[in-house]
Amino acid sequence: KCDVDIRK
């Protein structure tokens, strides 16, 4: 999982 949530 990435540090930033791109699934927003």
From Swiss-Prot:
Locations listed in the record: Cytoplasm, Cytoskeleton
GO terms under cellular component: cytoplasm; cytoskeleton
Key words of the record: ATP-binding, Cytoplasm, Cytoskeleton, Nucleotide-binding
Coiled coil feature spans: none
Family that this chain belongs to: Belongs to the actin family.
Extra facts: On the 2D-gel the determined pI of this protein is: 6.8, its MW is: 46 kDa.
Function: Actins are highly conserved proteins that are involved in various types of cell motility and are ubiquitously expressed in all eukaryotic cells.
UniProt protein name: Actin
